[in-house]
Amino acid sequence: MGGAIARGLIKSGMCRPEDLICTAKSEATRSKIREYDAAIRTGSNNGAAAAEADVIILAVKPWHVTEVMGEICPGLDLGRQIIVSVAAGVTLNDLEQLAGTPSLEERVGGRSFPFFRAIPNTAVEVLCGVTFIAQHGATEEQIGLVCRLFSALGYALVVDEKLMSAGTALASCGIAFAMRYIRAAMEGGVELGFRPEEAARIVEHTVKGAATLLLESGAHPEAEIDKVTTAGGITIKGLNAMEKAGFTAAVIDGLKAANV
């Protein structure tokens, strides 16, 4: 996810490659980052990289957060830095505990350090992502900065932290759920007589068109469905067959199961 965010920030023009410092333990990972743009600075020293940064994005596996926070926290500067974690399941309270917030507050006159959680989905790399943002201790200016960063990668919204799990199910897991529909429709297209590559392009553009119609019109999905559904027609027959097989219930059940 860290690589996807970095590539998206560069692609959107929000950041210049030379403004980014990407750290990773593996040289193979660092090399892959530089292959995208040689101007991106890479390294393995998290503490040194964090000391230079205004915005520190923790894009590591949850079980690595404790180690990384231990490396970067001694040099944190409340006056100019914020931390944004995209580690799944790591709460704002967890971040505060790992940072040793009381000692930080002593250094900065009692103010709390600004922490953010961000849950982006993988489409941020193509600037069509969805990112949920929660925060604690941040100023309006800092909230605006983080929102601008992730809005450059698609759609970003600030939510209460208790909705982060639901957001993960709806948008992050939702990418996989949408892909499963696309795969099923592609297979159906092949059964109807199209070649696999033809079916793939048809379904991809159909889904893109459906989403674009909603985004540009602001209409409810049912209003767009009504436009192509006539009495006794083939669309209503197809919709009814899908509902008989439990389409809507299956989607809702999948979202609820993923909301843990």
Predicted regions mapped to residue ranges:
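Short acidic capping loops at alpha-helix termini that bridge into adjacent secondary structure
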Residues: R16-D19, G79-Q81, E197
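Internal alpha-helical scaffold of NAD(P)-dependent oxidoreductase catalytic cores
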Residues: I21, D94-P114, V130-A166, A178-G218
